[in-house]
């Protein structure tokens, strides 16, 4: 649906916020994190570069234009896991990358907002929790630029804005 052409009254977009024809309200910034299935990693290895270097690395080949998404080389260098195995799985769907990590196929670099609840419920483990990679993408609430917001849309807009801000201080 194209909010800028009035096909929807409101939407949430992730990007750099440079969309024509919409009013935008910043919701939250995004960052990348390392995750895997809890079945894959012993608890004492969650922040261990040597353990990570032995794992299959899941690549999200989905385009992330302008997001400054970290490469595996950047991540491995940051967490001190040089000489990682070249065992890599390339997937061109972010949701399939997350499903692969959930099923124990390997370790993935993913957008935190997409897996936050899975981490909180223990379905995924965030590896190296002291390391996060800020992206240049943020989440925005968008509405058509030249259309007055209907009352029910305004109520939803305000509720969502309050809910997101209270969850992301």
Named regions from a protein language model:
Residues 1, 129-130:
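Short, solvent-exposed loop/turn elements at beta->coil junctions and helix N-caps
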Residues 35, 109, 142-144:
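Short hydrophobic/aromatic beta-strand micro-patches
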Residues 42-43, 66, 109, 118, ...:
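Loop/helix-junction capping segments adjacent to catalytic residues or to phosphate/diphosphate-binding pockets
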Residues 1-68, 73-90:
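Acidic, Gly/Pro-rich loop/turn segments at junctions of secondary structure
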Residues 25, 98-99, 154:
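Alpha-helical segments flanking ligand/cofactor-binding loops in enzyme cores
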Residues 81-127, 134:
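Hydrophobic hinge/microswitch elements
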Residues 116-117, 121, 130-169:
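C-terminal effector-binding regulatory domain of bacterial HTH transcription factors
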Residues 19-24, 28, 118-128:
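Ligand-binding "clamshell"
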């Amino acid at each position: 649906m194209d909010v800028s052409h009035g096909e929807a009254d409101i939407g949430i977009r992730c990007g750099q916020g440079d969309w024509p024809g919409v009013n935008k309200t910043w919701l939250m910034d995004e960052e990348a994190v390392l995750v895997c299935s809890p079945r894959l990693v012993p608890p004492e290895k969650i922040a261990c570069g040597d353990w990570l270097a032995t794992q299959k690395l899941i690549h999200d080949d989905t385009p992330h234009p302008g997001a400054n998404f970290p490469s595996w080389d950047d991540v491995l260098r940051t967490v001190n896991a040089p000489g990682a195995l070249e065992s890599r799985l390339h997937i061109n769907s972010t949701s399939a990358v997350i499903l692969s990590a959930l099923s124990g196929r390997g370790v993935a670099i993913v957008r935190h907002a997409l897996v936050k609840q899975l981490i909180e419920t223990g379905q995924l483990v965030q590896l190296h929790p002291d390391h996060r990679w800020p992206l240049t993408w943020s989440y925005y609430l968008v509405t058509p630029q030249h259309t007055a917001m209907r009352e029910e849309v305004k109520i939803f807009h305000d509720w969502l804005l309050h809910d997101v801000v209270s969850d992301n201080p």
